[in-house]
Regions:
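N-terminal hydrophobic or amphipathic helices and topogenic motifs
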Residues: 2-94, 290-324
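Short, glycine-/small- and polar/acidic-enriched structural segments
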Residues: 43-153
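A ligand-binding cleft/hinge motif common to bilobed small-molecule-binding domains
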Residues: 111-122, 184-190, 218-246
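Ligand-binding cleft/hinge of the Venus flytrap
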Residues: 72-81, 166, 179-209, 239-243, ...
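Short helix-initiation/N-cap motifs at beta->coil->alpha
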Residues: 87-97, 112, 195-218, 256
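A conserved helix-loop-strand patch within extracytoplasmic ligand-binding domains
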Residues: 130-181, 186-191
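Hydrophobic residues within well-ordered alpha-helices
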Residues: 99-100, 165, 220-221
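Periplasmic-binding protein-like
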Residues: 50, 54, 58-59, 127-143, ...
Length: 324
């Protein structure tokens, strides 16, 4: 395995790209570089990485007891691959940094961190998660949500529908959320209602960020916002209750948000990578499927092309005027 630029990336660059990252959460780096005679490039002697794989499982709001569930999946993969597999828990940012610093081989990532993992670690998505709450199997909708009794109505065109939001109080999920900010902002730009993300205040009467799906929806339920932007699956427990769901409706939807998936580091040899993918696909089989469902409520993993899967996100980022 070769040492790539990510292995020698300066601390300052990494800090800028991944603000607030706690790299030490993943322990000490076990790899050292050794120059092999008659070779122009350095070869990574991964002390332990040749006989241990590390998988990062990001914590999500709909996941509970994640370490034990991740350990169960790691144990299954270890049995299939014949090598120890270690499960690490951390947020998406820490997962990307672990890939960059060669402290992890595999990570479950949402789409925006997957782009960052490609940029910083040359990692790529090979599998995507399927959920019953995803309308597009391994893509889902970003939705503009209003109170059920709102005077705002879905019109014959997207522009006519969204034009009604001028001067209204808007609750986005967070400035980094794909379905809760990037895709809805890209849609507003596409319809010619705003120029980019920096002009949202010129269109809405108020712009706020809930911090997560639940809080953005609660802002609408409590009358603090006229509309919220979230993922379609957030209109279900545990994000809100069934009673709260019945008080809301979707005003407009934006399709094509890439589902979360599994990224594999480029330092993993091709043959090993294919074995990892095959082992993970065994989680789709009935006798193993509960292990997968327990993680993030996904029912299946499917193979995807990295560039094709993330293309809608790249387009939305460009429309919104946001760097990948």
């Amino acid at each position: 395995m070769k040492v790539t630029n990510k292995g020698v990336l300066g601390v300052g660059v990494a800090s800028v790209a991944l603000t607030g990252l706690l790299a030490s959460a993943f322990g000490e780096m076990r790899a050292i570089a050794n120059l092999i005679p008659n070779q122009k490039e350095q070869t990574l002697i991964a002390q332990g990485k040749t006989n241990e794989l590390v998988v990062v499982f990001p914590s999500r709001s709909d996941s509970t007891d994640l370490q034990n569930k991740a350990n169960a999946v790691a144990g299954f993969l270890s049995k299939q691959l014949g090598v120890p597999v270690k499960a690490q828990i951390g947020d998406d940012t820490a997962a990307v940094e672990a890939l960059r610093a060669n402290r992890a081989d595999i990570a479950f990532l949402s789409s925006r961190p997957a782009l960052k993992a490609e940029q910083l670690a040359n990692a790529r998505l090979y599998l995507a998660e399927v959920r019953p709450t995803y309308s597009g199997k391994y893509t889902y909708n970003s939705v503009f949500v209003v109170p059920k009794n709102s005077p705002l109505k879905t019109q014959s065109t997207a522009k006519a529908t969204l034009s009604q939001l001028r001067g209204k109080k808007m609750a986005f999920t967070s400035p980094t959320s794909g379905s809760g900010f990037i895709f809805p902002t890209g849609e507003l730009v596409k319809q010619g209602l705003v120029q980019n993300r920096d002009r949202l205040n010129n269109f809405f009467g108020q712009v706020a960020y809930g911090g997560n799906y639940s809080k953005a929806l609660q802002a609408v339920l409590r009358g603090q916002a006229d509309v919220a932007a979230v993922s379609e699956y957030a209109l279900n427990p545990p994000y809100i209750t069934e009673a709260e769901k019945n008080k809301l409706r979707v005003l407009h939807k934006v399709s094509g948000v890439p589902a979360h998936g599994v990224a594999i580091d480029d330092d993993v040899p091709t043959a090993t990578r294919e074995k990892i993918i095959s082992a993970m696909l065994l989680l789709n089989q009935p006798e193993n499927n509960q292990l997968l469902r327990n993680l993030y409520n996904s029912t299946e993993l499917v193979k995807v092309d990295h560039n094709q899967h993330l293309a809608p996100l790249r387009n939305a980022l460009q429309l919104a005027g946001i760097q990948p």
